[in-house]
Amino acid sequence: MKKVLLYILITISFAVSAQEKDKTLPKANEEYAEKKFVDAEANYRISHSKFPKRTVAPFNLGNAIYKQNQAGEAKFAYAKALENTKSRVQRHKVFHNLGNVFMQEKNYTNAVDAYKNALRNKPTDE
């Protein structure tokens, strides 16, 4: 009986810790919506450090950095988002934004490649 009770307690503790909620990401999203890109960037970085396997924080981090006219820095955040992305829709968004970064840098060859990759992940995009 003691072993069963111990097993149940251990299982519950793992389930609770595995479902830790990211409280920083919604705050960062609010700041981004309010055009507080520096604050949003900081909170996206915190969110990504707490949950490094998730895609949303590095993708949104790239967007916040891009809005601050730091395209070169945004590339690194988008690259990190690509590492964790499994969804074709999300990969499309990341590649599209990478294409925008390369266009801003006047790196047209890489921009075309990024846009092609975006279309490969979502062929119906116009």
Which residues does each PLM region occupy?
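Start-of-helix register in tetratricopeptide repeats
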Residues: 22-23, 56, 90-93
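Canonical positions in the second alpha-helix
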Residues: 47, 81-84, 118
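Short coil turns that delineate tetratricopeptide repeat
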Residues: 52, 86-89, 123
